Swiss-Prot record:
Protein name, as recorded: Protein PrsK
N-terminal signal peptide: 1-21
GO cellular component terms, A-Z: pilus
Principal location listed in the UniProt entry: other
Pfam families per UniProt: Fimbrial (PF00419)
Species classification: Bacteria, Pseudomonadati, Pseudomonadota, Gammaproteobacteria, Enterobacterales
Gene Ontology BP annotations: cell adhesion involved in single-species biofilm formation
Length: 177
């Protein structure tokens, strides 16, 4: 009985109402994503060990390198043989090729990214492996990077790095060719 009452009410509402037009929008996005970024590589956090601010008053004015890996997995068979390049993007510090930090040391500290060779500076906007990328040879691929904190030349000169939190954000983009 409840079902038929509901049906009657619906019918009454439809027959008593005026005709009304409404749009339905459909949207999508198709990707050629030969490999998936592993879950542990999405929204990655690289945490630098706590250091005294005075460590950034004298040359070389930098922290030890923290390593991190971007993992690609479930690479489709059509990806094998393709070259993948990874490019980090973010707000740059005045110190060329470094990421700008926020916090009390903005303009005094910067983040340097190291390329997959572990020693070459990877500038924001540049592709990894000196622009050459990596060949996808199987179902997965690991891209090892490093990062360190460095005092800007002005902060070294004036010994102006102070205690406090800092952070920087970079996004990465994968391109297949």
């Amino acid at each position: 009985m409840i079902k038929s009452t509901g049906a009657l009410l619906l019918f009454a509402a439809l027959s008593a109402g005026q005709a009304m037009a409404s749009d339905v929008a459909f949207r999508g996005n198709l990707l050629d994503r030969p490999c998936h970024v592993s879950g542990d590589s999405l929204n990655k956090h690289v945490v630098f060990k706590t250091r005294a601010s005075r460590d950034f008053w004298y040359p070389p004015g930098r922290s030890p390198t923290e390593s991190f890996v971007i993992r690609l997995e479930n690479c489709h068979a059509t990806a094998v043989g393709k070259i993948v390049t990874l490019t980090f993007k973010g707000t740059e510090e005045a110190l060329p090729g470094h990421l700008k930090v926020t916090g009390v040391n903005s303009g005094r500290l910067a983040i340097a990214l190291l390329d997959t060779d572990g020693s070459s500076l990877l500038k924001p906007g540049a592709s990894h492996n000196k622009g050459q990328g990596e060949k996808v040879t199987g179902n997965s691929l690991e891209l090892p990077f490093g990062a360190y904190v460095v005092a800007t030349p002005e902060a070294l000169r004036t010994k102006s790095v102070v205690p406090g939190d800092y952070e920087a954000t970079a996004t990465f983009e994968l391109t297949y060719r």
